[in-house]
Amino acid sequence: MPKETPGVSLGIHESQSRIFENQIGRSRQFTRWLFKKMKSYFGEFGIRDEEEFYRLVNKVETGFIRTEADEVHYNLHIMLRFELEVEVIGKNLEVPDLPEAWNSKFKEYFDRDVEKSSDGVLQDVHWSIGAFGYFPTYTLGNLNAGCLFEKMQKDIPGLADGFEKGDVSLATTWLAENIHQHGSLYEPGDLIKKATGKDFTPEPFLNYLDEKFSDIYEI
């Protein structure tokens, strides 16, 4: 019997961390709680109030480092890496030429000049350990997270009220019931449809970004 491909993908795995990092961790409600907690430990630390803290956590600006990127720019960092991977795997780009190709593409996407490789092609561990093709799972994770969080909010009225108290138990319970308990039983698209009642689509994630940052920047 041939071994079947495992069902759930790394794009689903990444969606779980992205939900907690972004939709929950960068929410106005959770950052309000976090600001108070930090102030109780550190006293004054140069940030005026909860609203300023929230806006700083969600500040949109171009930067060199993927792991420090805001939610708006993050997927551009992934696209850059993915396009270079395609070129390398397709033997259209040699490894010694990667730094120059990276810097050129970064300039095109972010309009900034990379001055050192630690801010560019050498900033991630993935390629050095042979993890080619992993980067797209982060964007897939973002898109899956958008689908799941949209449904979570509809299923749990007042979900964000708990975040303001540092309580994420309603979110973890919903994910346990709708995602975790199924393990690798379903293919990603089937799992998303089972959890949300809808086919996978980028729309919930795009709507989330539009609503959130339109509010922050009053646009």
Residue ranges and their predicted role:
Residues 1-2, 6, 59-65, 121-130:
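Acidic/His metal-coordination segments adjacent to aromatic residues that form catalytic metal sites
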Residues 4, 8, 23, 40-43, ...:
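Generic detector of intrinsically disordered, low-complexity, polar/charged segments
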Residues 4, 8-11, 71, 128, ...:
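Short, solvent-exposed segments of well-ordered alpha helices
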Residues 5-45:
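Post-HExxH zinc-binding segment in Zn-dependent metallohydrolases
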Residues 26-30, 48-53, 94-97, 187:
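General structural signal for secondary-structure boundaries
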Residues 36-44, 55-62, 95-106:
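Short low-complexity stretches enriched in small and charged residues
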Residues 41-63, 67-80, 85, 112-114:
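All-alpha helical catalytic cores of prenyl diphosphate-utilizing isoprenoid enzymes
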Residues 78, 82-219:
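C-terminal, non-catalytic "cap/extension" segments appended to globular domains
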